């Protein structure tokens, strides 16, 4: 820990201060408390049942998800931008704290712990009690490693590139000596380049690792290497140390995590598809109870799918058979094209009602400090079949279909919503057109002494 010893201009290069602090704090907390990165066994942070049953996120993964959502939002800015030029507080926080800390983590991943910490020590010893900047840090890294790193720092500090390496295809051939030659086709779907650690997993669970380093401005390459046994699975960056935005294509078979769908648990690993399960139960007078199961598949903010299956205990008195009910809902966000869009599907056959729905959702965030409100656009349609009134009395009988548009403008002080819908003939019993406007005002005020002082004087005082 060396702050107070090295000085920097936080207006010009905030990341040199805050980025190092964030990276070192995370490294310490993960070393002290494990990959979770906080004292999760303390009653102050978690309940007993959570410690026993929940799956907790990796602290590094949390930070990576935070930055991935930001850099894919369409509002990313370079880390090296002067603090007062960032367009909003989110950009400042990401580019002063989170993104540079992840850059340093990637640097440690490439160099290895020994060279990375030697670089930090060289940086400290050479510039203690002096002012530092970007060039002085890079100089220490290149001096200790003996390699040029402009390709690495330029992309991180002065651009807003995205990295997404993928395994396109692979096969292996047995050599005469019993070893295997692997042919691995690697493709970068983004525009930021980095060496990749390739892990080969064998059928007995053992692994071998080798670096692919033909990454300089090379979007696609065939990597040929030898392994000692027949390979079962290949992975790029198996420890999820880099800010590769989508790990679903980093492995020939992505790992899975199956767990109970505990309320409030928000488990989002970077390198696993998560499956959660939950019992489901319906009841009506005809079917009696219909027990079933809900299964959810999710990966970060890119994918969320839900399937429900239920089977009635009693037979239908007319058709003389048990009823089977199902439900599917899926939400998907593209990684590269149409990043600001979300596509939602819903189709189900539930007690008394069948329906199909498709919706496109687009969110637009404000660029500046409170200059514009957040805006959300929805365009979609739904088709609802005849209602079985024997099983539900919540809907009127008859087919219903509609196309709709919704616009929500939301700030800290108000919400303004526009809702337009129109029936689709001849698929609807009712013909209608509807437009509605809703406006809500909200502003919370507290009148403690500091808020009054700030309002009257225009600045914040600090106490000791």
Language-model region placement:
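Hydrophobic alpha-helical and helix-loop surface patches within well-folded domains
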Residues: 1-185, 193, 206
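Hydrophobic, well-ordered secondary-structure elements that form the walls
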Residues: 21, 104, 153, 234, ...
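Flexible, solvent-exposed coil segments and beta strand-coil junctions
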Residues: 83-84, 119, 270-276, 300-306, ...
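Strand-connecting loop/turn motifs
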Residues: 113, 148, 302-304, 336-340, ...
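Long, His/Glu/Asp-enriched segments that create or flank divalent metal/ion-associated functional microenvironments
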Residues: 163-236
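Beta-strand secondary-structure signal
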Residues: 181-185, 197-199, 222-224, 233-235, ...
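Outer-membrane beta-barrel initiation region
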Residues: 204-206, 224-226, 235-338, 359-368, ...
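C-terminal outer-membrane beta-barrel translocator/porin domains of Gram-negative envelope proteins
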Residues: 281, 340-348, 357-361, 378-380, ...
């Amino acid at each position: 820990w060396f702050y107070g010893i090295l000085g920097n201009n936080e207006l010009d290069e905030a990341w040199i201060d805050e980025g190092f602090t964030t990276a070192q704090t995370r490294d310490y907390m993960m070393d002290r408390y494990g990959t979770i990165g906080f004292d999760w066994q303390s009653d102050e942070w978690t309940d007993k049942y959570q410690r026993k049953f929940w799956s907790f996120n990796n602290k590094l993964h949390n930070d990576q998800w935070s930055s991935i959502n930001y850099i894919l939002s369409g509002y990313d800015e370079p880390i090296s931008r002067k603090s007062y030029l960032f367009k909003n507080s989110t950009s400042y926080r990401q580019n002063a704290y989170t993104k540079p800390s992840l850059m340093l983590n990637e640097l440690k991943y490439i160099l290895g712990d020994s060279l990375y910490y030697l670089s930090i020590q060289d940086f400290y010893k050479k510039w203690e009690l002096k002012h530092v900047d970007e060039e002085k840090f890079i100089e220490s890294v290149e001096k200790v490693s003996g390699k040029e790193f402009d390709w690495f720092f330029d992309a991180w500090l002065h651009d807003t590139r995205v990295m997404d390496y993928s395994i396109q295809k692979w096969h292996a051939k047995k050599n005469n000596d019993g070893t295997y030659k692997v042919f691995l086709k690697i493709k970068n779907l983004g525009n930021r380049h980095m060496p990749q650690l390739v892990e080969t997993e064998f059928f007995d669970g053992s692994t071998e690792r080798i670096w692919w380093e033909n990454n300089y401005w090379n979007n696609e390459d065939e990597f040929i290497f030898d392994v000692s046994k027949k390979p079962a699975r290949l992975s790029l960056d198996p420890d999820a140390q880099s800010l590769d935005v989508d790990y679903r294509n980093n492995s020939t078979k992505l790992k899975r995590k199956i767990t109970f769908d505990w309320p409030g648990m928000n488990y989002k690993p970077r390198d696993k598809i998560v499956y959660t399960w939950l019992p489901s139960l319906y009841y009506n007078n005809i079917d009696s109870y219909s027990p079933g199961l809900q299964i959810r598949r999710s990966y970060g903010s890119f994918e969320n799918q839900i399937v429900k299956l239920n089977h009635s205990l009693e037979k239908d008195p007319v058709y003389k058979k048990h009823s089977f009910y199902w439900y599917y809902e899926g939400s998907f966000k593209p990684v590269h094209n149409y990043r600001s869009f979300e596509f939602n599907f819903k189709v189900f056959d539930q007690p008394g009602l069948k329906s199909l729905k498709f919706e496109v959702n687009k969110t637009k965030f404000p660029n500046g400090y409170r200059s514009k409100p957040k805006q959300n656009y929805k365009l979609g349609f739904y088709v609802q079949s005849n209602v079985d009134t024997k099983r539900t009395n919540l809907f009127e009988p008859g087919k219903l279909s509609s196309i709709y548009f919704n616009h929500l403008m939301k700030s800290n002080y108000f919400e303004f919503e526009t809702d337009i819908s129109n029936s689709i003939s001849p698929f609807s019993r009712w013909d209608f057109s509807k437009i509605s406007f809703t406006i809500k005002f909200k502003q919370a005020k507290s009148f403690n002494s500091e808020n009054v002082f700030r309002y009257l004087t225009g600045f914040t005082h600090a106490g000791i």
